[in-house]
Amino acid sequence: MAAAILRFEDSRVTGPDSLRVSRLPAADKGGKWEICGICDGIEPAVFNRLKALLDAGKREEAWEGCLQYVLDNTAAARSWMGSDVHPATEFILRDHHFNSGSRNTGKILQRALNIHGAGLTVDGIVGPKTRQELQDQLGGTDEAVFLVGLQEKRKAFYRSCKQFPVFGKGWLSRSERAYQFACSLI
């Protein structure tokens, strides 16, 4: 999962040999530089450690560091699931979490659950009620059906962002690639 998320952040990266430091677009608020979505302006300590490894030629170690960072950074999404029985949903939640943060991921999740009558408050806080509803819905429906709603709410989230005119095409493309990857896990 983590490797796929890194590839969605930088499509030119396929593993340690192609791992690189890239300049962020001027409109990006994450800083000036990134390594597969790990930005100098958001996670400076992690970025600097990974960059130092790349500069020292320790590409394998840098790649492993990126993978571990993704897993650690998105662990909350995994905990919401309650088990590893639904890897496709876990993947979409982790990918969105890495790209848009915990609160925004919680909101798309709550909106997707509400499609099926959950009646949740959409506040982005994935508390006991949201977790139970997620587990109940996944236990009582086809995961592919749930993913359609989650994907719909993810795309709606991106379309609502102020920076959609600048980054929207890329966000929707990433979302579609992530959805296709998730479907392959079912």
Tell where the protein language model's regions lie, with residue ranges:
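Cell-wall polysaccharide-cleaving catalytic domain and substrate-binding groove, primarily
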Residues: 1-186
